[in-house]
Amino acid sequence: MAMKKIVVFAGRMFFLAAVSSIGAEALLAAPFGAFEEAPVAAIRPRGHLEEFLKRQADGITGHPEKLGYPFNTKLWEGPLDRVFFTEGVYNGDDEPKDCEGEEFWKSGMWWPYEQTAYQLDGMARVAQFVDAPALDAVVKRNLDWVYAHANPTNGDLFASLSASPSQWPLVVFFRAAMAYAEKHGDWDRLVKAFAANYEGKRSVRTKWGGRDMLNLEGMLKVMEFTKDASLLADAKAMYARSWERKTFGAKKHVIQHGVSLSEALKLPVLLYLYTGERAYLDQARAAVENVYEMDEQADGLFSCNEYTSGRDPRQGHETCVTADMMWTLGYFLQADGDVAMADRMERIAYNALPGSCTKDFRRHQYLSAVNQAVCGPFAQSAHFNYGESTWRQYRAAHFPQCCTGNINRSMPSFVRRMWMREKASGAPVAMLLGPSRFRGEQDGAAYEIVEETRYPFEDEARFTLKSDRPLAVTMKCRVPGWCDRPDAGKLVDLTLKAGETVSLALPAKLTLESDRNWHWIRRGPLTLSFVPPAETVEENPGDPFTALRITPKDGEWNYAFDLDEMKAAVAAAKVEFRKVGYPFEEPALAVRLPVRRIREWQTLDEGRFMPDPPLVAHPTGERAEIEFVPYATTLQRITCFADTEGRERLPVVAAYSNGELFPYDPGKPLADQSFEPEKWGPRDYTSRYQVPPRHPDLFFDVGAFFQGRKTECTLTYLTFRVWSDRDEANATWCLSAGYRVQAFIDGREVYAADGISEGLWMAPVWIRHPVKKGYNYMTVKLAHPGMWSMDQYPRLWGARLVVFAGGKEGK
């Protein structure tokens, strides 16, 4: 019987339900949702998934001393002695700090602890699934120190490490503590320590917003043990007043930091799991669908060059998000076994994640992209830190160091959710496919299910039941939504008998995928890429963790698809399956397909940046056949190709402003802040001021136009004039604009973006709207919220428009 323990903080008492002898196998679960996590000990990866984790343990996960600051410190085992800034500034106030001892503690810096907590979580999770006692030992030492040094007055677990008011590092550290407890049964210490931490902050926790609000995850987990209903009440109150509750599910482009967004997307799912209120789950699902609608990339993740940035394949995504998004999607699986979310998890795990790191797991990218012929220092072609960072290079560590720590969580988080249990029956569920085994018990008899497969590199999974007793076990297995069978997208029942094997066919077709004016090849969960010839140079030969410089050969990747030819070729293609040792390193399958060489797209922009696929491609007449291999095996790659469809680019003749700045309140929706120019006809602008383009790609720089005036917290209007010599129903307006944006054609809103975007390097949104013969107009309302200065990011405020007519476009 559980005992009640009285805990006193500053004269105030609360009751903490003490949980006696919680073992590693004793899991509690959220009260709602159809499925629950299985005990860690029940799950074991095999084959190439086990090898991935072993390489992690031998790579950056197991060698933090190779990664520089802050990983070569004591991590959370005591306050850090010193902070170093070698490549930039990142401490919340943009003032460099190089301090030590008490001075460091007083500085209130939180970021070294975020990054080292990521590392500890990754270490704990890898050690869940492979034999890595050294990793377990590091995690235990850090937990011991933190639990022993909680503030005696209010239970604060972070106050001994930093004076920072940020609650975000504890979100990350909680997951490391939870991972360790899942394996070792260390729930007593976790629950007591974190319950005290949350109780000591009872008076302020409902006011937590942003990343502080992500403590909701730990609060609800602790509530499973303590039954403290105030934790749920405050979690609901926290979310109710949040920006996310007001924004998630809205059918508009939400521009948000990729890590913050992927972390926050789990909050309404968690609230559903603990309340059963369907509205939370519906909002969460709508929010995920909206993010993918606006920002999806061909490798299964969404763009986030720090901030979400549209769909085009020059955009990248922060490697942190491979971990954060899979962690979030896993909660959808617990809620209702959503097969579409599981499909997304597999596409991230089998494409985006391995495509962002070297195959020995000793180097990774900060920003990874589906099209990256060049991967070297200062080759960063996405809008954020354009040309000013090493983020596209494969390195052991980057600055800031968040991705270096966070990537360690990615694959073990995927493995953690491979097998679940159905709550109603206790039946095992193969939710994510791959070589693995599951151990369970039925009617007092122990059993083991072994999944033999090379999936996703083959089209079959074989399930064998092993038991010392005659036994029949009915399990559930997910059939992916892309699968060429009538029950695709469902969970199906498989009945296994001891000693017998049941095979599940997973037929996959080669498909041609299209989006706007670029196209790529896919097979089941795998995205396929072309690897252009390149020169790879080690910066420090002989160092197994040295950075790589990958430079393509000009003219060896400027291909496009003839769509009719490619459709026929894909339908008739024979995929070559190969026997390889490690399919994340050597291609286990390949296919050769026809392409057309084009005059455009054969050199890097400015000699070092990956250009966009051209809107209008001109074939040279040369036909070639190139090999496509799994994205996961590549470093440099071309995944998305332009086409040879005939399009006509229409001239954007000019852009006009009325020369006025209007007051803007960042706390209110942009659509609710309208001024007189919104009522004007386009010609009301043309007699006023013409805004000169400040970039060869016709970026109209509003910030430069208003130079010398106070622009923070203002908005203005910009009208584009476009000429067409004919009426054309099949026309596309490609708009890139920032900061906050609302666009109109013929007085009708055609696009809105909520959040910070960057006008020059934002991927264009594609707006289908006909053009008429003569002049055509688009008016764009542009708000400057004032959080970033024009001096710091001079290209943020403005817009770029490309309009073309004709051709066949994807969705």
What are these regions (language model features)?
Residues 474-478, 723-743, 778:
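Aromatic-lined ligand-binding clefts that engage carbohydrates, nucleic acids, or primary amines
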